[in-house]
């Protein structure tokens, strides 16, 4: 998992980075959004990771 940058916006932690395709959808990579608290503590798992569009960190 390559995470380039983390930021909290409007109570939502936006992780700018990519993950293997098997983690989310059939695409090669996906950007992630996780709960702000989970982001702060670094506790991110597949169950709380959501794809938000095309990954720009290829």
UniProtKB/Swiss-Prot annotation:
One of its GO terms (molecular function) is glutathione-disulfide reductase (NADPH) activity. It catalyses: 2 glutathione + NADP(+) = glutathione disulfide + NADPH + H(+). Keywords: Cytoplasm, Disulfide bond, FAD, Flavoprotein, NADP, Oxidoreductase, Redox-active center. Its cofactor is FAD. It comes from the Bacteria. Disulfide bonds join 13-18. The keyword DNA-binding does not apply. It is found in: Cytoplasm. The keyword Flavoprotein applies. GO terms for cellular component: cytoplasm. Catalyzes the reduction of glutathione disulfide (GSSG) to reduced glutathione (GSH). Constitutes the major mechanism to maintain a high GSH:GSSG ratio in the cytosol. The active site is a redox-active disulfide bond. Homodimer. Belongs to the class-I pyridine nucleotide-disulfide oxidoreductase family. This is Glutathione reductase.
């Amino acid at each position: 998992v390559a995470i380039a940058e983390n930021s909290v916006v409007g109570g939502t932690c936006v992780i700018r980075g990519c993950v293997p395709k098997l983690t989310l959808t059939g695409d090669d990579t996906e950007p992630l959004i996780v709960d702000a608290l989970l982001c702060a503590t670094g506790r991110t798992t597949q169950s709380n990771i959501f794809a938000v569009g095309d990954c720009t960190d290829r």
